[in-house]
């Protein structure tokens, strides 16, 4: 018995020491987070309770434990509540950092320049057997000659992004392709002209799914020239600078804030701003562009509208080939596109893992509640068995009465005989009996009274 008692004490001491260690670590982490938060309180007052960039918030506020009720027999529940508080502070600190980085990226337009390789080719079928057939013969054939035009693309030089993504993702194979952008996401409109009469148009605003390429299928056996116009989807919106303003600022296509900033640098470098009146005196170049002698700085955005236009589309010429190998006629082009930093991309793998952990925690918390109710049941039964059984039976009877009573009078009234001596009872019984149909008597069941003999 002494050995068992010693072993139990050792287990209890080990358990308490582990709990104390966890509590100490939580206290240290809380102190560190408090210091960091206090130093950054003035940096941003944005609401950080919501999830940022697809990172799910940890546990919902409803997932808590009744610490006051459990601490008497399960002191470890206090550690769980402390972990929840620590997790909230950790999420708040991370979200603050993400917001700061996002605001800095918006101001500085942090983008990665990547190379998008565009491939244009076509395939064909049922062409060789129709060289010597006229139009009437073609109409009589079931399998008509056809061709398909394919426009595809993929990003090159993905090694750098993959290294960054691997540092923030798990080692699963699916995570390496989770955040790859689709080809159609880089364009907002694609216009294809086939010959002189046939045209096709794809608009990003009218579609809900992204694709890895575009395919056009047509029936025919003639080689035609195809013109492809592709409009890049710039985020933020970019504009083409027209005329003399483009030569003055040495800008062809850029965002409106950058164009205004370049114009402001030109004004400052040439000392065209009057410090007293805050007006800009136009030199010969600005006079030729804006046709004004002087202007206010707040007039610049409105004046720029006449000198900005949507950027030019990417134009490609392709000739349809209906003989030979398709790879021999494939055309490839490299396009420079802007891609966001990998840190801002949502991480589906991490979100799924966090969601699974949250579900597991919720499952265990529900088990804790179940065991708590069982313990309360057993505790009441052990303290006052008779009274507890009487209370439980009374509650069950009430539930049974509510579930089985189908009339509006109540279950208790129907238990007394006086309920059935009411005037309506006789009427209800008569109605019930009148509805009962009696079977028709059969010929064998009909009894005839003997006839009386007639006297002559």
From Swiss-Prot:
Domain of life: Eukaryota
GO cellular component terms attached to this protein's record: cytoplasm; nucleolus; nucleoplasm; nucleus; SWI/SNF complex
Predominant cellular place of this UniProt entry's protein: nucleus
Keywords attached to this entry: Chromatin regulator, Nucleus, Transcription, Transcription regulation
Domain SWIB/MDM2: 234-310
Region (Disordered): 435-456
Record GO biological process: chromatin organization; regulation of transcription by RNA polymerase II
Subcellular location field: Nucleus
A UniProt-annotated Pfam family: SWIB
Stated family: Belongs to the SMARCD family.
Function: Involved in transcriptional activation and repression of select genes by chromatin remodeling (alteration of DNA-nucleosome topology).
Subunit structure: Part of a SWI-SNF complex.
Record-given protein name: SWI/SNF complex component SNF12 homolog
């Amino acid at each position: 018995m002494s050995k068992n008692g010693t072993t139990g004490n050792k287990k209890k001491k080990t358990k308490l020491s582990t709990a104390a260690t966890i509590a100490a670590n939580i206290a240290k982490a809380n102190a560190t987070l408090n210091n960091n938060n206090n130093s950054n309180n003035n940096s941003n007052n944005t609401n950080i309770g919501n999830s940022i960039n697809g990172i799910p918030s940890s546990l919902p506020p409803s997932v808590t434990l009744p610490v006051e009720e459990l601490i008497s027999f399960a002191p470890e529940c206090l550690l769980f509540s402390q972990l929840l508080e620590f997790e909230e502070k950790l999420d708040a600190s991370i979200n603050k950092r993400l917001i700061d980085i996002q605001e800095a990226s918006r101001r500085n337009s942090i983008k990665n320049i990547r190379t998008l390789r565009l491939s244009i080719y076509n395939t064909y079928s049922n062409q060789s057997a129709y060289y010597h057939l006229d139009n009437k013969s073609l109409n009589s054939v079931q399998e008509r000659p056809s061709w398909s035009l394919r426009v595809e693309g993929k990003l090159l030089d993905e090694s750098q992004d993959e290294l960054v993504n691997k540092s923030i993702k798990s080692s699963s194979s699916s995570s390496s392709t989770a955040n790859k952008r689709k080809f159609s996401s880089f364009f907002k409109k694609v216009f294809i002209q086939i010959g002189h009469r046939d045209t096709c148009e794809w608009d990003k605003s009218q579609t809900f799914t992204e694709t890895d390429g575009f395919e056009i299928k047509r029936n025919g056996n003639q080689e035609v020239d195809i013109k492809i116009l592709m409009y890049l989807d710039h985020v933020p919106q970019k504009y083409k600078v027209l005329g003399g303003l483009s030569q003055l600022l040495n800008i062809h296509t850029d965002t409106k804030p950058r164009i205004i900033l370049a114009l402001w640098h030109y004004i400052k470098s040439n000392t065209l701003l009057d410090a007293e009146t805050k007006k800009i005196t136009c030199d010969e170049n600005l006079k030729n562009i804006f046709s004004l002698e002087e202007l206010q700085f707040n007039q610049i955005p409105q004046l720029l509208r006449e000198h900005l236009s949507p950027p030019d589309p990417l134009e490609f010429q392709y000739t349809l080939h209906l003989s030979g190998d398709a790879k021999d006629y494939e055309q490839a082009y490299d396009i420079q596109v802007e891609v966001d930093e990998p840190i801002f991309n949502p991480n589906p793998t991490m979100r799924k893992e966090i969601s699974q952990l949250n579900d597991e925690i919720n499952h265990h918390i529900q088990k804790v509640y179940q065991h708590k109710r069982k313990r309360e049941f057993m505790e009441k039964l052990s303290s006052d068995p008779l009274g507890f059984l009487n209370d439980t039976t009374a509650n069950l009877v009430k539930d049974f009465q509510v579930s089985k009573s189908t009339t509006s009078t109540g279950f208790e009234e129907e238990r007394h005989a006086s309920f059935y001596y009411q005037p309506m009872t006789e009427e209800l019984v008569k109605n019930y009996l009148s509805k009962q149909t009696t079977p028709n008597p059969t010929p064998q069941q009909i009894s005839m009274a003997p006839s009386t003999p007639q006297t002559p």
